[in-house]
Amino acid sequence: MKAIIVLLMVVTSNADRICTGITSSNSPHVVKTATQGEVNVTGVIPLTTTPTKSHFANLKGTKTRGKLCPNCLNCTDLDVALARPKCMGTIPSAKASILHEVKPVTSGCFPIMHDRTKIRQLPNLLRGYENIKLSTRNVINAERAPGGPYIIGTSGSCPNVTNGNGFFATMAWAVPKDNKTATNPLTVEVPYICTKGEDQITVWGFHSDNAIQMVKLYGDSKPQKFTSSANGVTTHYVSQIGGFPNQTEDGGLPQSGRIVVDYMVQKPGKTGTIVYQRGVLLPQKVWCASGRSKVIKGSLPLIGEADCLHEKYGGLNKSKPYYTGEHAKAIGNCPIWVKTPLKLANGTKYRPPAKLLKERGFFGAIAGFLEGGWEGMIAGWHGYTSHGAHGVAVAADLKSTQEAINKITKNLNSLSELEVKNLQRLSGAMDELHNEILELDEKVDDLRADTISSQIELAVLLSNEGIINSEDEHLLALERKLKKMLGPSAVDIGNGCFETKHKCNQTCLDRIAAGTFNAGEFSLPTFDSLNITAASLNDDGLDNHTILLYYSTAASSLAVTLMIAIFIVYMVSRDNVSCSICL
């Protein structure tokens, strides 16, 4: 009997366990799926980040425009857009621009009534073009315009480069020279003079003052009427007579009068018209602008470079496809805003160790990824583990791993394509704006962002569902492959594990991973079949009757012993016999 017990122990100690699985981290992760809700998985790829505020920067790979004219000192962007005498410099080309002035006004030049027109949008309009250039010649001869002759007015509050009286180069202040009388509406045509098919931005306006000054300058104290028309857009104005504060809004020299400034955009070959009375500011030099430059609200100076410029966070370097936090407009290679953090599954469903101990025993629980990962392998790799007297061996199955990587890469690419499409959708409306400020309405933009966020979240849920199902399929395929290779040399004990009838060290496991495994190379003597061999009995003085007597005596004794044991167990179960054991 002792020999049989020893034999059973040897068989047990030589049995190794081989399991299929996926390497993972030491703790489960949670992902959301479309139909299963939250699922614990062995690995994840974070898709979102939460940025922190930083300074604005130059956009990588593009020229970024801060001020319209960096070399124009002490000039606002509106000064540059109106061509104030001391603010006429070169505007560099740029594919991205920073709207850095909250309330653009002129500095120390003739006071403008900003609220009467869309003049504040003029610098923003110019920022929206990649190339901007002021014409070298005037669009009309102001001195000989209808209602003239005129003298061109200047102002001491708008000094030129020699500190003499001056005025904006984009407009001519037409003051009647001799005929200072009231006039009926007059019309002047504004030709297209740009030479390279650019948009022509024509600036014009009118001056108004108190009644005394109106009579002195123009011979008429009544409100004057003005109209501009270009590309089917017509605008009407009536001047205000008097009532202006002495101190100007711009902080310049005290003025009793004000000017109203507007602009019109003329497409190639299109003529504009201006209908006017007294006090008109006739157009002179025009802006010729082409190309597109994306505009975003920000601040100066621009420090360093960044992948993305975000109105709330400044310069960002893109590390993830999506971000959470505060939503706002952004330009460049930017992550897309989503409401909640997103994770993409990178593994199978996680099974806790406690469950495995119950189902597979101690050795089964510690084998494979299910206990928290394999040492020495890259997270997410498919393969096999072997546990036995040799310790733990690990081997990767390259084909299965590559298939899983391809599946996850495909899902990431799909999400990336969705990201690009949504970015194009967001920026498309901005690119189409030509005559308006290049800003999307906040409410419309937020609504669109919410919709896109929901679409992305759904796409991630569906991707997680597909990845988890695909990973499970890969593991099942790996398990079937292992079972086929092991054949009768192993017993399937469930959950992707097999108990082998031979040792399986690192060499054995590498053969399995390579598909060249041969059980015969690693097998020990087995006890799968009962071998019966003939035996010869030698005559040692015992005859056949004596031998039969010994056997019958032993058999009878064994039978009696078993009957007594059965009787005692039966009586104990009926409570007819009590048994006490004392040491």
From Swiss-Prot:
GO cellular component terms given for this protein: host cell plasma membrane; membrane; viral envelope; virion membrane
Alphabetized GO MF terms: host cell surface receptor binding
Query: Which residues bear sugar attachments?
Result: 40, 74, 160, 179, 246, 317, 346, 505, 531, 544
Signal peptide positions on this chain = 1-15
Main subcellular location of this protein, as a coarse class: virion
Disulfide pairs? 19-497, 75-87, 109-158, 504-508
Which spans are transmembrane here? 552-572
Keywords, A to Z?
Answer: Disulfide bond, Fusion of virus membrane with host endosomal membrane, Fusion of virus membrane with host membrane, Glycoprotein, Hemagglutinin, Host cell membrane, Host membrane, Host-virus interaction, Lipoprotein, Membrane, Palmitate, Signal, Transmembrane, Transmembrane helix, Viral attachment to host cell, Viral envelope protein, Viral penetration into host cytoplasm, Virion, Virus endocytosis by host, Virus entry into host cell
Lipidated residues (S-palmitoyl cysteine):
579, 582
Record topology, Cytoplasmic segments: 573-583
- Stretches of the chain found on the membrane's Extracellular side: 16-551
Q: Where in the cell is it found?
A: Virion membrane; Host apical cell membrane
Q: Does the keyword Membrane apply?
A: yes
Residue(s) at site: Cleavage: 360-361
What does the UniProt record tell us about how this protein is modified after translation?
A: Palmitoylated.
Q: How would you describe this protein's topology in the membrane?
A: Single-pass type I membrane protein
UniProt function note: Binds to sialic acid-containing receptors on the cell surface, bringing about the attachment of the virus particle to the cell. Plays a major role in the determination of host range restriction and virulence. Class I viral fusion protein. Responsible for penetration of the virus into the cell cytoplasm by mediating the fusion of the membrane of the endocytosed virus particle with the endosomal membrane. Low pH in endosomes induce an irreversible conformational change in HA2, releasing the fusion hydrophobic peptide. Several trimers are required to form a competent fusion pore.
Q: How does it assemble?
A: Homotrimer of disulfide-linked HA1-HA2.
Q: What is this protein called?
A: Hemagglutinin
Where does this protein come from, organism-wise?
A: Influenza B virus (strain B/England/222/1982)
Coding gene? HA
